[in-house]
Amino acid sequence: MKIAIDAMGGDHAPKAVVLGAMKAIKEYSDLHITLVGKEEEIRQCLMSDERITILHTDEKIESTEEPVRAVRRKKQASMVLAAQQVKDGEADACISAGSTGALMAAGLFVVGRMEGIERPALSPTMPTVDGKGFVMLDVGANVDAKPIHLYQYAVMGSVYAEKVRGIENPRVGLLNVGTEDGKGNELSKQVFAMLKDAPINFVGNVESRDLLQGVADVVVCDGFTGNVALKSLEGTALALFSMLKEQLMSSFTSKLAAAVLKPKLMVLKDKMDYSEYGGAALFGLKAPVIKAHGSSNDQSIFSAIRQTREMVAKEVIPTISSVMEKESLQ
């Protein structure tokens, strides 16, 4: 199995990417990794090149650049070359912690869209209080969705949850303003009717306040709604931890309590860190394309590689294609 990784993408590149890749190579004997980026910088962090190949390029896409234009103009950028490795059959999948917009553009223009899928979806795995997590799609790839798009997202998310996350008959919920049938805008109502007849375990509407309670294994929404929900959850978690830290550091007594509670607080922090679940998959493309978090450390990169490997090994893309074909969506 071969995975191409943009070694220059992310806040801590290339060090975090290289260390994460080496950790994955030690863990999986069937894995070969191509690191795309500045060879000199990569080799400074690389302690062993066993089953690791370096594809040198000096070019990268900056987060400040317009995504589509950058992908079209910078053919030798590390992210674009990683995607090109997939298109040329040199890699089974690719990963980048770089610009989300640029990776979506590279996925569409280089890797290519799966036949029958109108709009790809960006899908991270989010944390829940029980530690199991849930898949949410879309969170920003397609902000102006049609009912057929969300129908396809539900099917793709269900296949992923079953194949990669090992959830038998995963529960699929539609993010809405209420749990009752008939709630929501016209898009939600149309999608609800379609999902009732879909070949999935549709559990109906779910509200954002219940997401962290694990109300569903797959949560479907348009990209605008999903992005707002994602960032609201992120912001709330950061604010709560910040307020908790402030209170625990406010006096000598509370500092003593903090020292006692520290191991438990670290467990809680890790449980709510969605980067540990891997990256956000771009569903609807011809091959797995994974967006790692921009601030990924080596462990987060390793998690993204593990996730990508599972997608390839469990044949998620061919399975999605087969299900779509049966549903006459191709």
From Swiss-Prot:
Compartments (UniProt record): Cytoplasm
Pathway named in the protein's UniProt entry: Lipid metabolism; phospholipid metabolism
Principal localisation: cytoplasm
GO cellular component, one term: cytoplasm
Family designation: Belongs to the PlsX family.
Protein role: Catalyzes the reversible formation of acyl-phosphate (acyl-PO(4)) from acyl-[acyl-carrier-protein] (acyl-ACP). This enzyme utilizes acyl-ACP as fatty acyl donor, but not acyl-CoA.
Subunit structure: Homodimer. Probably interacts with PlsY.
This protein's name: Phosphate acyltransferase
Organism: Bacillus cereus (strain ATCC 14579 / DSM 31 / CCUG 7414 / JCM 2152 / NBRC 15305 / NCIMB 9373 / NCTC 2599 / NRRL B-3711)
Originating gene: plsX
